[in-house]
């Protein structure tokens, strides 16, 4: 056991296949260079703190229950009993759909293992973090957790080990945060309800999505930005068909395309959250500045190969 341990877990974007992945198709997800830092200290009683602006405040809401429950499960898994102080520091925008809840779960598990000198495997971290995600989202696919644990770009099918996609070039994507809050579990239920109205159509779209994941994977590896953009536009149309768009995200997608992006789409659950877009690298900075002028949080992200990491200071 150590005085303090730290773990940093990246957030994520879904490049293609969200919602379809819940129903057996594949998705492509990527870690991003924004994430969650968790610090673990010994304490006289269990405490959870999180950053709000420049202050760290103790959280006493229902939102901390999954963290407390996850801490208990992780301690049981490693065979330890010790009250802990958990301090969460995030540079992922609130309610952005960029995987903050998954990253919190992943970083918490990893930091606890480091604190007690237990070498948790990636699979251990994934399984424990998923138990926390299920308490929040009900029936998550696991793709958010996998992206945070393993890093890089991954091809993911529910119930299978993720496959990492290795790219020679550095891909940079634009992220725009809509500011619209939504609940992932409700959107998953909405998608499931609408798809049940036309099961044959959904089955055809599910099969098409699985094939197009291969096309997107090839486009990412070959750095074919125009093809990546075209496939993004297709997937966004699918999500819109199932009622997962929002007037604000639609406006942001139209704006990004008008500024010269090859493609743009909702990322994650939809209904708000964030939009991702792709453009030539020399245009990215100008596009993000122009969108920020409209009052939206907008930034570019890189896709780090490294997933969760932990250390002691």
State where each predicted segment sits.
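Short, histidine-centered active-site or binding-site loop motifs used for metal coordination
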Residues: 19, 52-54, 90-92, 270
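Short clusters of hydrophobic/aromatic residues that line enzyme substrate/ligand-binding pockets
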Residues: 28, 92, 98, 156, ...
């Amino acid at each position: 056991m150590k005085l303090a341990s730290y773990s940093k877990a990246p957030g994520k974007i879904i490049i293609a296949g969200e919602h379809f992945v819940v129903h057996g198709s594949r998705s492509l997800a990527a870690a991003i260079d924004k994430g969650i830092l968790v610090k673990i200290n010994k304490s006289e009683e269990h405490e959870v703190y999180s950053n709000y602006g420049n202050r760290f405040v103790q959280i006493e809401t229902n939102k901390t229950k999954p963290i407390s429950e996850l801490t208990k499960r992780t301690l049981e898994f490693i065979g330890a009993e010790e009250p802990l102080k958990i301090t969460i520091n995030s540079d992922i925008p609130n309610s952005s759909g960029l995987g903050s809840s998954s990253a919190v779960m992943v970083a918490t598990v990893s930091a606890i293992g480091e604190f007690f000198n237990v070498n948790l495997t990636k699979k251990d971290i994934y399984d424990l973090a998923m138990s926390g995600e299920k308490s929040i989202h009900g029936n998550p696919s696991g793709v958010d957790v996998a992206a945070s644990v393993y890093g890089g770009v991954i091809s993911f099918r529910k119930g299978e080990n993720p496959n990492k996609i290795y790219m020679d070039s550095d891909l940079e994507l634009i992220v725009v945060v809509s500011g619209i809050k939504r609940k992932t579990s409700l959107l998953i239920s909405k998608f499931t309800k609408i798809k049940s109205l036309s099961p044959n159509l959904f089955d055809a779209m599910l099969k098409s999505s699985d094939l197009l994941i291969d096309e997107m994977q090839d486009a990412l590896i070959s750095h074919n930005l125009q093809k990546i953009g075209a496939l993004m536009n297709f997937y966004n149309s699918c999500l819109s068909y199932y009622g997962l768009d929002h007037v604000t995200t639609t406006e942001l997608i139209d704006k990004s395309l008008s500024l010269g992006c090859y493609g743009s789409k909702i990322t994650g659950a939809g209904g708000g959250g964030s939009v991702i877009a792709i453009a030539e690298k020399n245009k990215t900075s100008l596009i993000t500045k122009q969108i920020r002028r409209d009052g939206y949080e907008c930034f570019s992200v890189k896709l780090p190969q490294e997933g969760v990491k932990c250390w002691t200071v």
